[in-house]
Amino acid sequence: MLAMDFAPQNRLGAAVSVAKDFVSRRPNDRFALVAFSEYALTQIPLTFDHQAMINSLEKLQVNEQASGTAIGMGLAKAVARTFQKVRQKSRIIILITDGVNNTGEIDPLTAAQMAKELGIKVYPIGVGSQGMVPFPYSDPIFGNRFINTFIELDMPTLNKIAEITNTGKAAMATDAKLLGSIMSQIDRLEKTQWTAKFSYNFSEQFMPFLWLAFGLLLLEILLKSFVMPLLPDQL
């Protein structure tokens, strides 16, 4: 995600920017963030706290010591840890990657099947142009510079994930503008209508007055039946 083919940002910076914009456009949604390279880690669990989500996005960094990309593990963790107990009708995962699954115990297609069984849609997005791309390199003599590096992007697997989870076909973003357009399209597709249900609790207040009226009526009957006949006529 450090490749600079999304200049002036690298791929990670571009992905973070569009993700923050996506969050800001959906004020009623909950979000979670799972980051993966060699390992998959939950950065923030499912939350309505959008500022916390944005803060987590801004803190994302590339682990340059990682020796692989675990797409399957990242997707599986998003499914199992984030959505397993969530019952909303619309549950989606936006899977953004620029590499090939080459490590991890769970295959991406197995993770996609897990998502399908729970009714979760996965929108895979491959970022970056395939082939030789400018990549930052710290040279001990010449300092920081860029070298052209070959980075492979496994679009066939991403397409299969989309097919399994019924989202059609994976998208490929070769620049920041196209990535933003793809996210906007997902935003339009996944609009959820919310139905508000209200429960009203009416407390009946007339019963004390009813009992009071009944008591007064009973008292009147008793007076007429037992007390009034005993009184002298002249009173």
Regions found by a protein language model. Name each.
Residues 2-4, 42-43, 102-106, 131-135, ...:
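Extracytoplasmic/secreted cell-surface and envelope-processing proteins
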Residues 172-206:
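Juxtamembrane amphipathic/hinge helix adjacent to a transmembrane helix
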Residues 69, 92, 99-164:
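VWA/integrin I-like adhesion module and closely mimicked acidic/polar interface patches used
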Residues 192-235:
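C-terminal signal-anchor/stop-transfer transmembrane helix together with its immediate cytosolic
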Residues 1-89:
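Membrane-embedded segments
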Residues 34-37, 96-99, 125-128, 173-174:
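Active-site-proximal beta-strand/loop segments in catalytic clefts of secreted hydrolases
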Residues 1, 22-30, 57-64, 78-86, ...:
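Sec/Tat-exported extracytoplasmic proteins
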Residues 15, 78, 122, 162, ...:
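Residue-level signature of catalytic and energy-coupling elements of molecular machines
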